[in-house]
């Protein structure tokens, strides 16, 4: 019997043994699902061997190809195996529980195509949320408000998202986007097809890079990716680029007391 649930975990510069998502998944019975690891690491962390030991599928391992290429490679692999069912996407640092899969198994029976959990950070619901045309997010004040919302401008982060694999009969992630905005762009495309986002009665507590202060060097690299991705996303909407990316550049300039962020802003436009 073919498994109806595939789990995709994208790991970046760490071993699967140290990945919170992989650690949590090992504690959950998963004989009824197949697990794919896409390794975006820039050096060998022994993840291929780890996957072989656990009967997981290992893909990637040729450097950081970006998130969209990672997802598309996994989708193409599943296509080749004639997979039909649902695919779940996870970062490598998601606090995963069995409750998620129990809720998802029941939700899959409805035939709906996209499911997302509630994702909390610092006591706030960060996902799902609403999003404007300028990619400004509007948080829901409560789970009840999120569950009752009927608008088409709802969005969510990738980690924890479950998708009917039928979505990928005529869709792939845009590989011009390396990392930032992939989730929002994807769900806007789905909304245009009248595909509704359904919310699971499950809660994750997720660690976000924005919750900490990295070194200036790391912040510059990270902002460079953000600016380049949104320069592409907003290539036909320059005011949105200046609003979203400019606002972040100004904040980082003040935070690090460096004009280098403004230089990246101007160079990426």
Regions found by a protein language model. Name each.
Residues 16, 37-47, 63, 94:
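A conserved acidic beta->alpha catalytic loop
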Residues 115-131:
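Short beta-strand-to-loop element that shapes/binds the nucleotide-sugar donor at the catalytic cleft/hinge
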Residues 132-154:
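Short, flexible, basic/aromatic active-site loop/helix in glycosyltransferases
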Residues 155-161, 166-171, 176-201:
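A short, conserved alpha-helix in the catalytic core of glycosyltransferases
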Residues 217-269:
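Non-catalytic, C-terminal membrane-associated alpha-helical segments of glycosyltransferases
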């Amino acid at each position: 019997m073919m498994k109806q649930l595939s789990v995709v975990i994208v790991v970046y510069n760490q071993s699967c043994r140290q990945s919170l998502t992989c650690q949590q998944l090992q504690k959950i019975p998963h004989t009824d699902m197949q697990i794919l690891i896409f390794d975006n690491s820039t050096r060998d962390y022994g993840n291929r061997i780890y996957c072989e030991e656990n009967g997981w599928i290992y893909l990637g391992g040729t450097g950081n190809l970006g998130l969209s290429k990672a997802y598309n490679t996994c989708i193409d692999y599943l296509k080749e195996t004639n997979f039909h069912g649902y695919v779940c996407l996870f970062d490598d640092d998601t606090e995963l529980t069995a409750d998620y899969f129990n809720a998802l198994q029941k939700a899959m029976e409805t035939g709906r195509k996209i499911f997302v959990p509630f994702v909390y950070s610092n006591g706030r619901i960060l996902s799902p949320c609403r999003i404007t045309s300028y990619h400004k997010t509007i948080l829901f004040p409560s789970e009840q408000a999120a569950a009752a919302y009927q608008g088409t401008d709802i969005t969510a982060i990738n980690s924890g998202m479950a998708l009917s694999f039928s979505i990928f009969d005529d869709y792939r992630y845009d590989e011009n986007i390396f990392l930032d905005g992939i989730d929002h762009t994807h769900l806007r495309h789905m909304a245009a097809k009248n595909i509704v986002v359904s919310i699971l009665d499950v809660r994750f507590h997720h660690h976000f890079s924005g919750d900490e202060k990295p070194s200036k060097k790391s912040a510059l690299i990270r902002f460079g990716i953000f600016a380049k991705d949104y320069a592409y996303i907003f290539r036909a909407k320059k005011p949105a680029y200046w609003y979203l990316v400019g606002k972040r550049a100004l904040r980082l300039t003040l935070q690090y007391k460096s004009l280098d962020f403004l230089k990246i802003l101007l160079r990426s436009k």
